[in-house]
Amino acid sequence: MSGHSNYPEWIYVAVVIALMAWVGAEAWDAERLVEHIPEGAEVIKVTAQQWFWTFEHEDGTKEIGELHVEVGKAYKFEIMSKDVIHSFNIHDYVVLMDAVPGRVNTVWFAPTDVGEHDIQCREYCGLIHYNMRGTLYVEESST
């Protein structure tokens, strides 16, 4: 075949490879951000059980159904369940992690705005699942 050029095919292959490299780099960067828990993040133990949440701060303070945190500070949640599978969700901050009996799962977040936010269970956990809610109170820093 005289006069046939492979130039368009090579351009197409190069563009596809460049796009794949770009998507891979973006995905790696996003995963690194999600998995990297900032140093100094306060640990809060989150325990799910039918049909409420309990929260325990590093200083031993315990809260049931509501969680008080400070704006601009990083928090690491250690999430567990006492009975069945639940799913810890703070929709406004895109926090979502399963609470599994016998296992501790971790997720972190740093609240950016003062206010109230819903905490809910996103995994069907029994008859009163619809009522397994809590409230996150993001408050001004006390220091």
What residues fall within each predicted segment?
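Solvent-exposed, conformationally flexible loop/turn segments
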Residues: 69-72, 100-102
